[in-house]
């Protein structure tokens, strides 16, 4: 009888555990146990699990590229993703952890307060173990918080305009205060978004102490997300905004838009973590590792800051985007600011 390979043994072990769980009336997620051996054993167990699910607030086009790249690298593992806002996704993660009925395996968030709190507590996560985290180009010491949350990407926001309506464009944030743009500007509603609250406060700290109040006087259109602002800019529903990511993708598609990063420009990092409630714990580790590889970063970085150097399509380095001051973004402080904002923008 030929000797069994280590990979065959791992696959057999995972299958046996699954069979025992089913026989005992257990649910499918409980059948998958994390492997603590060599990385090849983790990958083999991940292939036996066969799928992995990502929750993310990243751009849907980049997530689709990530799915293609990941499945090219790991054809035996299907990547599924749910794209939503932090307001929608973070409570799901908390509920899945509390109930022990996980759907997501990896969670990618841009909410700095949630990230800081969860990284400190370690409640929702397990440590990523993939070999790519040791890559000097990634720089684990400045890219991982609390040994669990790892820097994956960053959004950098700037000025955007419709070139048909504004052929001369915008040179500085002050150009948005031109009375001719009254009612034609788009902004993001900060309701529930600590990061967006930080963005408005950044405007007043760095551009003009009264910039937000002056912007409100322009009677801008309000959108639930930066993606909605970009779509409105592309269609001509609005003609300018101070709250859009680099419109690299839109320009490549022929949209009549342009953009500029002012000095300074506001940004917010994306951190990811392997969920303790992951129904596919080994596939979760494989996806986490892939996210910080060159292939993973290339898929995620069109119009964003990358966590590795020299990534095609990236507009900056994610490690250069400061983490927001979460002490100024407590739930009470965010609620108070949102009330102030509503008084200015929705009166």
Which functions belong to the PLM regions below?
Residues 113-117, 234, 238-258:
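A ligand-binding cleft/hinge motif common to bilobed small-molecule-binding domains
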Residues 151-156, 181-192, 213-216, 222-223, 253-278, 291-313:
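Periplasmic-binding protein-like
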């Amino acid at each position: 009888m030929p000797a069994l390979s280590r990979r065959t043994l791992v696959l057999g072990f995972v299958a046996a555990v699954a069979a025992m769980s089913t026989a005992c009336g257990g649910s499918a997620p409980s059948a998958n146990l994390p492997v603590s051996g060599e990385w090849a054993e983790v990958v083999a167990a991940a292939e036996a699990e066969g799928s992995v699910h990502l929750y993310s607030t990243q751009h849907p086009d980049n997530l689709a590229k990530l799915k293609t790249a990941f499945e090219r690298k790991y054809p035996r593992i299907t990547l599924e993703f749910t794209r939503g806002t932090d307001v929608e996704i973070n409570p799901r993660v908390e509920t899945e952890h509390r109930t022990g009925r996980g759907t997501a395996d990896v969670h990618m968030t841009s909410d700095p307060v949630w990230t800081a709190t969860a990284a400190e507590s370690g409640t929702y996560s397990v440590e990523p173990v993939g070999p790519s985290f040791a890559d000097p180009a990634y720089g684990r010491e400045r890219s991982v918080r609390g040994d669990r949350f790892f820097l994956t990407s960053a959004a950098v926001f700037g000025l955007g305009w419709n070139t048909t309506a504004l052929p001369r464009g915008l040179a500085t944030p002050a150009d948005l205060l031109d009375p001719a743009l009254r009612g034609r500007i788009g902004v993001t509603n900060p309701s529930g978004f600590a990061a967006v609250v930080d963005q408005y406060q950044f405007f007043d700290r760095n551009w003009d102490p009264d910039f937000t109040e002056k912007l409100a006087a322009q009677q801008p259109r309000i959108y639930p997300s930066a993606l909605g602002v970009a779509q409105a800019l592309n269609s001509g529903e609005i003609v300018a905004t101070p709250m859009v990511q680099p419109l690299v993708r839109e320009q490549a598609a022929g949209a009549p838009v342009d953009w500029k990063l002012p000095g300074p420009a506001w940004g917010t990092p994306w951190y990811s973590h392997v969920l303790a409630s992951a129904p596919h714990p080994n596939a979760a580790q494989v996806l986490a590792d892939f996210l910080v590889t060159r292939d993973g970063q290339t898929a995620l970085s069109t119009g964003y800051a990358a966590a590795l150097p020299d990534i095609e399509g990236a507009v900056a380095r994610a490690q250069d985007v400061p983490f927001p001051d979460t002490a100024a973004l407590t739930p009470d402080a965010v609620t108070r600011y949102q009330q102030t904002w509503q008084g200015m923008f929705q009166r």
